[in-house]
Swiss-Prot record:
NCBIfam families hit by this protein: PRK14891.1-1
Source organism: Saccharolobus islandicus (strain M.14.25 / Kamchatka #1) (Sulfolobus islandicus)
Protein's name in the database: Large ribosomal subunit protein eL24
One Gene Ontology biological process: translation
Domain of life: Archaea
Subunit structure: Part of the 50S ribosomal subunit. Forms a cluster with proteins L3 and L14.
Cofactor(s) this protein requires: Zn(2+)
Cofactor stoichiometry and binding remark: Binds 1 zinc ion per subunit.
Keyword Transcription regulation: no
UniProt entry keywords in alphabetical sequence: Metal-binding, Ribonucleoprotein, Ribosomal protein, RNA-binding, rRNA-binding, Zinc, Zinc-finger
Length: 61
């Protein structure tokens, strides 16, 4: 049975058969639910805690 993965950037669950797997040079695997998450992490180096649409969002006092 296929397993659901969790997006490495936003934290949302990825249904089986969708998403993108990115493998770094050191062998770690990153799973992304959309190109928005992939670009935010790899291209723009954004912090997921600062964006409300992620599950890792934390309000800063």
């Amino acid at each position: 049975m296929p397993t659901t993965r969790q997006c490495s950037f936003c934290g949302h669950e990825i249904p089986p058969g969708t998403g993108l797997m990115y493998v770094r040079n050191d062998g770690t695997m990153l799973w992304f639910c959309s190109s928005k998450c992939r670009k935010s992490m790899l291209k723009y180096h954004r912090d997921p805690k600062k964006y409300k649409w992620t599950t890792r969002y934390m309000k800063v006092r």
